[in-house]
Amino acid sequence: MKLSIKYIVIIVFSLILSFSFEKHSYAIYDPTSKPNNIVGIHILFPSELSEAARLVNSANGDWGYVTIPIQASDKNLIKWQAFMDDARINHLIPILRLATDGDYFSKISWSKPTDGDVLDFANFLNSLNWPTKNRYVVIYNEPNRGDEWGGVPNPAEYAEILSYASDVFKERSDEFFIISAGLDNASINIPGQSVNEYSFMREMDNAVPGIFGKIHGLASHSYPNPGFSQPPSLYGYQGTASFKHEQDLVQNLEGKQLPIFIIETGWTDTKISESVQSAYYKYAFTSVWNDKNIIAVTPFLLRAGMGPFAQFSFIKDGLQKQDKYKTLQALQKNKGEPELNEYPLSKTNPTEKDFPLDKFTKNIEQNYTATVSKATKILMKWLLNI
């Protein structure tokens, strides 16, 4: 009789323990099913959120998008929870792009990510409160370029990383919306240096059959190439409509139409005047990027400062708003209605003690984290003493 009671307690305890781990039963929703403001902007720093909101939520718009990279060495809970809180306050939908370590402004080659890097990101990003139900995560950047993939591009390696990312993020929460990396649409096949994006995508599917069926969205770098200078009326494989060719290829490979996130695009002011750029942006948003399957367009870049990205910057010399900024701000927008998460905002000046988790390991075997009380430990010892 005593043994039977113990077995009953074990069953009850097991059920209780199964709920002691952090789990998420929610799932992503189809962003095309909701009113949506596709207008966004690419930023580099969380401090730019309020300025971004003034740009993308203007002219009747609401809940526009921001794309921002997060580097492997930048997993600061206080910083990134404040970012999520500020995005919620400013009605911005965040798109986080995973990045390895390097320098945005001066780099020879970004390091190649590992499974451990991906797991680390999954643990960290799952610890944050996100403003929207869909947690948009882009898995790295332009892997068809060698300087973005440890020196030599490798579609098979990227496909494996993308597949693993889909698995490990979804194990932690069904709210993660996994988006493949935007590819360089100007790259040509140069052994050891770069791979044409369409060849790269085919080789990805050859290496991991069905890889595009494991993800939820397709990132596109629909730059007006060659030379960041072509008019948007050209619908070539390298232009502002390259997203369409990428989407069609996935449709042919997988029989699936993926939502499109144009997270980088833009014209260079070294070749195209501000007035012409303004006309190009207006045409592109109204006649090219008005595809019903496009979820967001976040041109590169809000504020670049000095350096190679200055040619794309919407704000120059600190505060000088370019003509393209004013054009995008004046563009009539929709009021987005994303599904939102409700959670208490963090303190104005939080400390590490305000967060439940502040360390993230790269142990591939680590899948769950649980806190077990002293009383629970005693009960476990008693139960095991049969």
Describe each region flagged by the PLM.
Residues 29-31, 40-44, 50-57, 78, ...:
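Aromatic-rich peripheral "rim/lid" segments of glycoside hydrolase catalytic domains that contact
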Residues 9-20:
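Bacterial N-terminal signal peptides
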